[in-house]
Regions:
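Hydrophobic alpha-helix feature that most strongly marks membrane-spanning transmembrane helices
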Residues: 233, 238, 242, 284-287, ...
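Short conserved catalytic/interaction loops centered on acidic-Pro-aromatic/His motifs
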Residues: 78-79, 97, 132, 309-321, ...
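C-terminal, helix-dominated tail/subdomain
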Residues: 257-258, 318-371
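Glycine/tryptophan-enriched, flexible segments
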Residues: 93, 115-255, 356-371
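Trp/Phe/Arg-rich N-terminal binding region typifying the photolyase-homology
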Residues: 1-131, 220, 284, 330
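C-terminal substrate/ligand-recognition segments
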Residues: 235, 264-310
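Generic, well-ordered alpha-helical scaffold segments in large soluble proteins
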Residues: 87, 202, 213-217, 227, ...
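Helix-loop-helix junctions that connect adjacent transmembrane helices in secondary transporters/permeases
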Residues: 243-278
């Protein structure tokens, strides 16, 4: 068995900054993995290329019988995997993919009629009803370590070699803090308290097991478990409705809102210079560290979309650029909820007034606020 990792240039070449914390995190994790493999006489083979080109090199360098990877639910990833599967098929190589980053995926938790849920609460109830300990079993990976292809260690390409720079970011540990999980329901909504796990980046990039976390949460804190269920829910939505990952609203009617889209106000929101302390603190923390407390994410997002009437997709894109734990499904899911809330609010306002209301005429501005 030959472990490989591909720094996908289709993704990396689109990143706006050479100082990207996510790339630095992945690079650090790969170096740690390489150290573990070296102790077993194996080596991680790292490519910096498009996935298709990387596999073209692999089939030239090695005699390959099977390729194994895990499911990825993002639109680009699905197209990528289909391309690789076709290429491997042309070379008589089997391609196997497996569930790994969620507890339940795709069609595993659906309505009784087989249709996907679009509302979280009934999905959560069905998720919990479906759950049993067998879904949280750990896999005895140690039994298979002797299957690694034995070869001398190869260095992981430096960040500079793949076009990126080191960052001064201190990455959170991958070990769950049990005290935080136990108190999560009581402390999670207070930004001044270290009451969140900071494990989002590890869940995003697979350096911690979702099953391990869910197993702990089932006995320690149901509120924490609910957050993991939200993660499954958003991945399920992205799978069944891939258009949401391509800049489109969940439903077409959510796009009728007439946004103000003031570019100067958006720039001040991005920089943390709105004059609203909680908003500014959150945005400045995001820019400086790549982290923002979940409650503050909700506040800053609501401020942008509901007060400034700036298209939520502008904020979604900015968070996607800056968040260390950026996950397309969760980021899109949380931002797109704002468009639904606004759609409902405006519809209710129309009913109350008895006439059509153009919300773009509301006085939503930060120009006159103190800085």
């Amino acid at each position: 068995m030959l472990p490989i990792f591909i720094f996908d240039t289709n993704i990396l070449d689109q990143l706006p900054s050479a100082t990207d914390r996510r790339v630095a995190f992945i690079h650090s994790a790969l170096n740690q993995l390489q150290q573990q493999l070296t102790q077993m006489g194996a080596s991680l083979q790292v490519y910096h290329d498009t996935p298709l080109n990387a596999f073209k090199k692999l089939v030239q360098q090695h005699t390959i019988d099977k390729v194994f990877t895990n499911h990825d639910y993002e639109p680009y990833a699905r197209e990528r995997d289909d391309t690789i599967a076709l290429f491997l098929q042309q070379h008589n190589i089997s391609f196997y993919t497996y569930k790994d980053q969620v507890i339940f995926e795709k069609q595993e938790v659906v309505k009784d009629d087989g249709k996907p849920y679009t509302v979280f609460t009934p999905y959560s109830r069905k998720w919990k009803a479906t759950m049993d300990p067998s879904y949280l079993k750990s896999f005895p990976t140690e039994k298979y370590f002797n299957n690694f292809h034995q070869q001398s260690a190869r260095p992981v390409p430096s960040l500079n070699a793949i076009g990126f720079k080191e960052t001064d970011t201190t990455f959170p540990p991958a070990t769950p803090d049990k005290a935080v999980i136990k108190q999560y329901d009581k402390q999670r909504n207070f930004p001044a308290i270290e009451g969140t796990s900071h494990l989002g980046v590890h869940l995003r990039f697979g350096t911690i097991s979702i099953r391990q976390l869910a197993k702990q949460a089932t006995t320690m804190n149901e509120t924490f478990l609910n957050e993991l269920i939200w993660r499954d829910f958003f991945q399920m939505i992205l799978w069944h409705f891939p258009h949401v990952g391509k800049g489109k609203a969940f439903k077409p009617e959510y796009d009728f809102i007439q946004w103000r889209n003031n570019e100067d106000e958006f720039a001040r929101w991005c920089a943390g210079n709105t004059g609203y302390p909680i908003v500014d603190a959150g945005m400045r923390e995001l820019n400086a560290t790549g982290f923002m407390h979940n409650r503050v994410r909700m506040i800053t997002a609501s401020f942008l979309a509901k007060h400034l009437l700036i298209d939520w997709r502008w904020g979604e894109s900015y968070f996607a650029e800056k968040l260390l734990d950026f996950d397309l499904a969760s980021n899109n899911g949380n931002w797109s909820r704002l468009s639904r809330e606004l759609q409902v609010a405006v519809a209710m306002q129309r009913l109350i007034s008895g006439s059509s209301i153009r919300i773009c005429k509301q006085k939503s501005s930060i120009r006159s606020l103190h800085t």
